C-alpha cells in the first residue's frame, strides 16, 4: 500500500486528535486487508477515557489502548508516529507483519 507523506503531514498538523486517530485506524485497516480482506479495525472513544482500538478477523484478536495524551503527542511528533506506535504494539502482541508492495510499512516500521 502506498502512502503520501505530504498529505499525512498536513493531516497531522491540521486535524483534531480523534479524527486523526480514525484516519490512522482506517489506514491500518486498509493495510491489513491487503493481507486478509476480513480484517476489521474498530476505534472506540469516550470523552475523558482512553481510546480502544480492536483488530479482528472473526473475533477480536488484538487490542491497543491509548490515552488521549499519547495520541496527541504522537500526532505532534510526526505524521506516522502514531501508526508506528500502534504497529509496534501489535507486534508485541504477536502480529506477524507481512511483506507488502508500496511504501506505507516503510514509513511506519
List each language-model region with its residue ranges.
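Intrinsically disordered, low-complexity regulatory segments enriched in Ser/Thr/Pro
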Residues: 57-88, 95
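A short, charged
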Residues: 84-109
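Negatively charged, low-complexity tracts enriched in Asp/Glu with abundant Ser/Thr
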Residues: 1-43, 75-88, 92
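Polar/charged, Gly/Pro-rich intrinsically disordered segments
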Residues: 3, 60-72, 100-109
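Amphipathic alpha-helical interaction modules
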Residues: 29-66
Amino acid at each position: 500500500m502506498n502512502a503520501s507523506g505530504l498529505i499525512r503531514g498536513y493531516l497531522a498538523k491540521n486535524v483534531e486528535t480523534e479524527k486523526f486517530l480514525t484516519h490512522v485506524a482506517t489506514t491500518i485497516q486498509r493495510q491489513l486487508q491487503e493481507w486478509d480482506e476480513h480484517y476489521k479495525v474498530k476505534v472506540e472513544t469516550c470523552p475523558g477515557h482512553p481510546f480502544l482500538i480492536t483488530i479482528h478477523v472473526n473475533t477480536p484478536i488484538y487490542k491497543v489502548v491509548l490515552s488521549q495524551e499519547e495520541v496527541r503527542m504522537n500526532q505532534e511528533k510526526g505524521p506516522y508516529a502514531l501508526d508506528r506506535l500502534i504497529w509496534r504494539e501489535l507486534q508485541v502482541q504477536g502480529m506477524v507483519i507481512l511483506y507488502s508492495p508500496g511504501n506505507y510499512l516503510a514509513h511506519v516500521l
